[in-house]
């Protein structure tokens, strides 16, 4: 399943994936056995390619992490557009780890997602939710920082 979620079979000359390819990513994820719901709010303004790519990759990595760490958890992907930002939030209903579990963000996945967001002038947080589950929340400016 992780191979399917991380699949990056784009030819070098094909355009980088963006939010326009989110339905395809969600279908691949569902076909791999993960239950995913998607909520989109607002109308997408014209976005720089870097913002499209960062949002897509953050969602892709989050889904990969759910498959790796939360098993068959249910996942909700939310994309919200406003005048200034694209907000991406990925929640799963997996169980929180017992005491002594690895700290959040010690792997390269969350670190890489955070780097993508901050490189564009945005931010990303990730952590366990009270009562169980995990949330990744990113804010990406509609216009990337100069």
Tell me what each language-model feature is.
Residues 1-146:
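Glycine-rich ATP/GTP-binding catalytic cores of kinases/NTPases
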């Amino acid at each position: 399943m992780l191979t399917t979620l991380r699949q990056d079979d784009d030819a070098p000359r094909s355009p980088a994936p963006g939010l326009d390819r989110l339905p395809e990513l969600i279908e691949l994820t569902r076909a791999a056995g993960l239950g995913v719901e998607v909520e989109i709010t607002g109308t997408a303004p014209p976005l720089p390619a870097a913002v499209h790519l960062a949002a897509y990759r953050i969602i892709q990595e989050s889904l990969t992490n759910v498959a790796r760490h939360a098993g068959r958890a249910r996942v909700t992907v939310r994309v919200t557009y406003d005048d200034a930002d694209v907000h991406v939030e990925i929640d799963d209903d997996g169980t929180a780890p017992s005491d002594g579990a690895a700290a959040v963000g010690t792997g390269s996945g969350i670190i890489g997602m955070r780097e993508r967001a901050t490189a564009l002038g945005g931010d990303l947080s990730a952590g366990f939710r009270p009562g169980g589950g995990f949330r990744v929340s990113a804010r990406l400016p509609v216009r990337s920082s100069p």
